[in-house]
Amino acid sequence: MIVAARIFAVGGLTSFRALFYWLTPWIYVPTMLVAPIFQILLFAYIGRSAGLESDEFYLIGNALQYASIPCLFAMAQMVGGERYQNTLSAILVSPAPRIPLFFGRSLPVLLNGAFVAAFSLLVGALVLGVHLPASSLAPLGLVVLIAAYSCTGLGLINAAASLRIRENAVLSNVIFGFLLIFTGANVPLDAVPKWMSTAAQGMPFTHAIAAARQLAAGASLGDVRGLLGAELLVGAIYGVAGYALLRWFEVQSRRYATLERS
């Protein structure tokens, strides 16, 4: 139990720190802290000029949705990067239990995604002059954490795909685009075709964004518990599927004695 806990905590943190091994950590600021603010401003001003939704609508949608950048790219890089640096094979031949090994790498990503979303939400609100009720801040923090958890589950699937795709950044960008369009971040789900709104129910962020907007409008945490439960379920399904894919690809790699099957 102690060994598993150490693998979960120390292994995950070490792997996350390795993301910045070759790059100066200062790249974190424009990528994770500045870019989401400009995304929020872009859609907010488009909405203003077109007379569509309020600044609050675009603020909440884009702040939460931008958590997909750290969640998708970091999870893929943790596996794909170790594969590229030839350390993944040494990890996979170790007797370490796989659940703490893989999910331990997810925890720093989850926390980072939640931080990016929370930072974007607060700074974006200050820039746009959006008032968020003080009573909604703590519930919104919980929603942000759940949203990051849900997308980290999808990121685990993305990480598994990096064992078969050489340039996973392309796939990560495609998934980011789908989440931007389908989750209601910028277009209300009742304004899109039925099949899109149906598909959105199985995607990260959809329920979290809806819950956050209700909380900002004055709803209580109890009023959105159904939406939060749905978001947790979506994240759990993606997480289990991602872990299963990683294990299956590991078995295939052992069978063919190589990780290079892409």
What is the predicted role of each segment?
Residues 1-262:
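Hydrophobic transmembrane alpha-helices and immediately adjacent juxtamembrane helices
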